[in-house]
Amino acid sequence: MDVQFKKMQGTGNDFIVVKYDDFPFEEKLSQLAEKICDRHFGIGADGLLIVNPSSIADIRMDYYNSDGSIAAMCGNGIRCFSKFVFDEGFLRTKQFSVETLDGIKEIAIIEEKGTVKSVEVNMGQVTYDTEKIPVVSEDGYFINKKITVGGQDFIITAVSMGVPHVIIFTEKLDLEQIKFFGPLIEKHAIFPKKTNVNFVHRIDKDNIAVRTWERGAGYTLACGTGSTSAVAVANKLGLVNNNVNVEVEGGNIKIKIKESGNLFMEGPAENICSGRFFFN
């Protein structure tokens, strides 16, 4: 069957967007994600976004990693999703709510000259609760603790931003090392559901650089929940202020920490192409 899709990207993190009405086979969505996201035999993307109606919010987003696994939340993905539903006329207002497996997220569309310039998302707060992340620990938190993988020690902090994240501060962002150690940390025994891995370089109080190895997707050019988690941890440790620019390989993301403690992420969302994918 032919599946109508749109391909989008947010700071280099790319996604395929499909309306559920165009593929109403929930039991086959994981298989669709694997096939359509394949960069050699499919369209190619980091993940699949499904547009669904919601009974508790204005609309619902379901997200599948490129390996077919389900993720509760995707920061760059929800920006692309929000631009899609706004541009396609699903919602007429610039502020709306999106249901995710990580709860309801509040969205603000930012336009310039009649086109969507960027999207702001209320990401909520990170949790350090080891049971909710989850991570195996004798304490109720996992902050600045040592683990050893591949013969090398790392000081890590584990949090959840709807999905599990590890934050590692480093003086140098070495892509070769990130791609080697990333999957080893992702699958470390202390993470029963695996984890995303973020290598973070602090530039100054207002700027950091983040490189992410994503659970279920591998190395990506950006990770919204990872960037948000990195700022939250850096702020908690006194390394950055409340308004931080995050440099990722695919561009820049702005993270603001409000008085409530909620983290707001703002970044671009752009169309790449649209078409029909033959699925069998």
From Swiss-Prot:
GO CC annotation, single: cytosol
EC number(s) stated in the UniProt entry for this protein: 5.1.1.7
Key words, A-Z: Amino-acid biosynthesis, Cytoplasm, Isomerase, Lysine biosynthesis
Enzyme class: isomerase
PROSITE patterns: DAP_EPIMERASE
Recorded catalytic activity of this chain's protein: (2S,6S)-2,6-diaminopimelate = meso-2,6-diaminopimelate
GO biological process, one term: lysine biosynthetic process via diaminopimelate
Pathway membership: Amino-acid biosynthesis; L-lysine biosynthesis via DAP pathway; DL-2,6-diaminopimelate from LL-2,6-diaminopimelate: step 1/1
Residues annotated as the enzyme's active site: 74 (proton donor), 223 (proton acceptor)
Site (Could be important to modulate the pK values of the two catalytic cysteine residues): 165, 214
Protein origin, superkingdom: Bacteria
Presence of the UniProt keyword Isomerase in the record: yes
Ranges in coiled-coil conformation: none
Cross-referenced InterPro entries: DAP_epimerase_AS, DAP_epimerase_DapF
Molecular function terms, GO-annotated: diaminopimelate epimerase activity
Major location (coarse): cytoplasm
Ligand binding (substrate): 13, 65, 75-76, 196, 214-215, 224-225
SUPFAM superfamilies: Diaminopimelate epimerase-like (SSF54506)
PANTHER family: DIAMINOPIMELATE EPIMERASE (PTHR31689:SF0), DIAMINOPIMELATE EPIMERASE, CHLOROPLASTIC (PTHR31689)
Subunit structure: Homodimer.
NCBIfam families associated with the record: DapF
Family per similarity comment: Belongs to the diaminopimelate epimerase family.
Protein name per its UniProtKB record: Diaminopimelate epimerase
Organism of provenance: Alkaliphilus oremlandii (strain OhILAs)
Name of the gene this protein is made from: dapF
